[in-house]
Structures are given as structure tokens and as C-alpha cells.
């Protein structure tokens, strides 16, 4: 598969995920910059992203979305898996070794946070994910390093 096609597919999938997040109406009700106590483990924005940082960020969001009971996020979680596969292809084309992403210790406390503020967790996670994806889209145009 030509790497240009992989890069185009990656960008298209990112745009699709952003659209899916927009379609979940309640995600518009919280600013991604809003501080919600206990949700510091949800990644914020990283202006300069390498392929490995993108993969790591997506892995964290996958773990968070997998722990949410909302059916809204199932397709988005599947899309993130596919997006990570595309990033792995891009990384392989540049001979970048992507480290295995391990479960985050900070997510072990996720259950407690979810019980306290399920709705807020979903809204903040999706809002920040959307911002991160838009950052990744911009970064892919700059041909990110490993």
C-alpha cells in the first residue's frame, strides 16, 4: 500500500471520528479547557506530536472510552483502534519502532471517578479527544517524526 494512501486514509478517519463526536450532541456543553476535578488523567492538547505520542494518546483515550458504559462511544473506540493501526503503518514506513503502550496506572482510579461523574467524564474525554485529533490532523501535514 502506498504510504500516501495510508496518510490520506489516516486523515479521513480522523475527520470521521471528529464528526462522530460532533454528532453526540451533549459533547458541546463542556469546554475542553474546563477543569473537572479528578479528570487530570485525560490527555490535554500536545501541539508537537510524534507518531509514538499520537499512538500513546489514542491508547489512553481507548482505555477511557472502553470504561464508559455509554453506547455512544463504542464506534469511536473501534475507530481509534483502526486509527492506531494506520499510525503503526505510517511509523513502519519511517522505520519507527512504536513502543508497546501499557495500561496507565492513573486509569486504575478511573472507576471511582466514573461512579462520581460519569456524564462529565464522557463529555470531557470526547471534547479533549476531538481537540487532540484536530492537532494530529495538522501534525500529519507536517510529516511527523517517530
Curated annotation (Swiss-Prot):
<dbReference type="GO" id="GO:0008343">
    <property type="term" value="P:adult feeding behavior"/>
</dbReference>
<dbReference type="GO" id="GO:0030217">
    <property type="term" value="P:T cell differentiation"/>
</dbReference>
<dbReference type="GO" id="GO:1900745">
    <property type="term" value="P:positive regulation of p38MAPK cascade"/>
</dbReference>
<dbReference type="GO" id="GO:0042102">
    <property type="term" value="P:positive regulation of T cell proliferation"/>
</dbReference>
<dbReference type="GO" id="GO:1900015">
    <property type="term" value="P:regulation of cytokine production involved in inflammatory response"/>
</dbReference>
<dbReference type="GO" id="GO:0038108">
    <property type="term" value="P:negative regulation of appetite by leptin-mediated signaling pathway"/>
</dbReference>
<dbReference type="GO" id="GO:0005179">
    <property type="term" value="F:hormone activity"/>
</dbReference>
<dbReference type="GO" id="GO:0032310">
    <property type="term" value="P:prostaglandin secretion"/>
</dbReference>
<dbReference type="GO" id="GO:0006909">
    <property type="term" value="P:phagocytosis"/>
</dbReference>
<dbReference type="Pfam" id="PF02024">
    <property type="entry name" value="Leptin"/>
</dbReference>
<dbReference type="GO" id="GO:0046325">
    <property type="term" value="P:negative regulation of D-glucose import"/>
</dbReference>
<dbReference type="GO" id="GO:0032735">
    <property type="term" value="P:positive regulation of interleukin-12 production"/>
</dbReference>
<dbReference type="GO" id="GO:0043410">
    <property type="term" value="P:positive regulation of MAPK cascade"/>
</dbReference>
<dbReference type="GO" id="GO:0045765">
    <property type="term" value="P:regulation of angiogenesis"/>
</dbReference>
<dbReference type="GO" id="GO:0051897">
    <property type="term" value="P:positive regulation of phosphatidylinositol 3-kinase/protein kinase B signal transduction"/>
</dbReference>
<dbReference type="GO" id="GO:0032755">
    <property type="term" value="P:positive regulation of interleukin-6 production"/>
</dbReference>
<dbReference type="GO" id="GO:0019953">
    <property type="term" value="P:sexual reproduction"/>
</dbReference>
<dbReference type="GO" id="GO:0032099">
    <property type="term" value="P:negative regulation of appetite"/>
</dbReference>
<dbReference type="GO" id="GO:0090335">
    <property type="term" value="P:regulation of brown fat cell differentiation"/>
</dbReference>
<dbReference type="GO" id="GO:0032760">
    <property type="term" value="P:positive regulation of tumor necrosis factor production"/>
</dbReference>
<dbReference type="GO" id="GO:0032817">
    <property type="term" value="P:regulation of natural killer cell proliferation"/>
</dbReference>
<keyword id="KW-1015">Disulfide bond</keyword>
<comment type="function">
    <text>Key player in the regulation of energy balance and body weight control. Once released into the circulation, has central and peripheral effects by binding LEPR, found in many tissues, which results in the activation of several major signaling pathways. In the hypothalamus, acts as an appetite-regulating factor that induces a decrease in food intake and an increase in energy consumption by inducing anorexinogenic factors and suppressing orexigenic neuropeptides, also regulates bone mass and secretion of hypothalamo-pituitary-adrenal hormones.</text>
</comment>
<dbReference type="GO" id="GO:0032868">
    <property type="term" value="P:response to insulin"/>
</dbReference>
<dbReference type="GO" id="GO:0032008">
    <property type="term" value="P:positive regulation of TOR signaling"/>
</dbReference>
<dbReference type="GO" id="GO:0051726">
    <property type="term" value="P:regulation of cell cycle"/>
</dbReference>
<dbReference type="GO" id="GO:0042269">
    <property type="term" value="P:regulation of natural killer cell mediated cytotoxicity"/>
</dbReference>
<dbReference type="GO" id="GO:0098868">
    <property type="term" value="P:bone growth"/>
</dbReference>
<feature type="disulfide bond">
    <location>
        <begin position="96"/>
        <end position="146"/>
    </location>
</feature>
<dbReference type="GO" id="GO:0046850">
    <property type="term" value="P:regulation of bone remodeling"/>
</dbReference>
<dbReference type="GO" id="GO:0010507">
    <property type="term" value="P:negative regulation of autophagy"/>
</dbReference>
<dbReference type="GO" id="GO:0032757">
    <property type="term" value="P:positive regulation of interleukin-8 production"/>
</dbReference>
<dbReference type="GO" id="GO:0032814">
    <property type="term" value="P:regulation of natural killer cell activation"/>
</dbReference>
<dbReference type="GO" id="GO:0005615">
    <property type="term" value="C:extracellular space"/>
</dbReference>
<protein>
    <recommendedName>
        <fullName>Leptin</fullName>
    </recommendedName>
</protein>
<dbReference type="GO" id="GO:1990051">
    <property type="term" value="P:activation of protein kinase C activity"/>
</dbReference>
<keyword id="KW-0964">Secreted</keyword>
<dbReference type="InterPro" id="IPR009079">
    <property type="entry name" value="4_helix_cytokine-like_core"/>
</dbReference>
<comment type="similarity">
    <text>Belongs to the leptin family.</text>
</comment>
<dbReference type="InterPro" id="IPR000065">
    <property type="entry name" value="Leptin"/>
</dbReference>
<dbReference type="GO" id="GO:0051428">
    <property type="term" value="F:peptide hormone receptor binding"/>
</dbReference>
<dbReference type="GO" id="GO:0046427">
    <property type="term" value="P:positive regulation of receptor signaling pathway via JAK-STAT"/>
</dbReference>
Amino acid at each position: 500500500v502506498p504510504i500516501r494512501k495510508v496518510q490520506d486514509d489516516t486523515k479521513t478517519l480522523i475527520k470521521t471520528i471528529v464528526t462522530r463526536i460532533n454528532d453526540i450532541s451533549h459533547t458541546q456543553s463542556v469546554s475542553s479547557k474546563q477543569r473537572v476535578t479528578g479528570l487530570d488523567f485525560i490527555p490535554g492538547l500536545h501541539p508537537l506530536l510524534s507518531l509514538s505520542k499520537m499512538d500513546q494518546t489514542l491508547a489512553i483515550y481507548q482505555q477511557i472510552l472502553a470504561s464508559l458504559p455509554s453506547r455512544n462511544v463504542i464506534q469511536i473506540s473501534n475507530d481509534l483502534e483502526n486509527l492506531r493501526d494506520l499510525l503503526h503503518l505510517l511509523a513502519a514506513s519511517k522505520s519507527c519502532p512504536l513502543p508497546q503502550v501499557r495500561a496507565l496506572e492513573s486509569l486504575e482510579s478511573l472507576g471511582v471517578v466514573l461512579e462520581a461523574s460519569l456524564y462529565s467524564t464522557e463529555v470531557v474525554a470526547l471534547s479533549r479527544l476531538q481537540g487532540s485529533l484536530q492537532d494530529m490532523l495538522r501534525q500529519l501535514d507536517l510529516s511527523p517524526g517517530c
